[in-house]
Amino acid sequence: MRASPLITTLAAIGAALIVIDGDTIRSDEERIRLEGIDAAEIGHAKCEAERRLAILAKHRLEQLLGSGDVDIRRNAHPKPPDRYGRTLARVLVDGEDVACILIKGGYARHWTGRREEWCQSLDRRDLAEATLSCAVSY
């Protein structure tokens, strides 16, 4: 199945949606990375706190995606897939940006263009400042 270049409303096409981790989902055969955020890794966690946060982020993303109508929005001029072959896209539930919700909730942080260390910054006080606002730009 070839995905729409701009918006896919999952209810309209009957696509199955699987949450891989806190920033990656799969819709049918397409792997999608939530653009603009980074969530802790489940399989490659470097400490127990990162692994726990990764599991919480995955569960929160599952809750969000199950709570309403899901739209996957790709750029009109799509970026190439990331180095893992994932499509970069915004994901909205009932019109709300899932990436912003995850950032504000402390489940993810802004993507800076490179993987940041989670274990040293998992003190909630360190994350609190970063989660006060969501200015994910697309």
Question: Where on the chain are the PLM-derived regions?
Answer:
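Small beta-barrel nucleic-acid-binding modules, primarily SNase/OB-fold domains
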Residues: 2-138
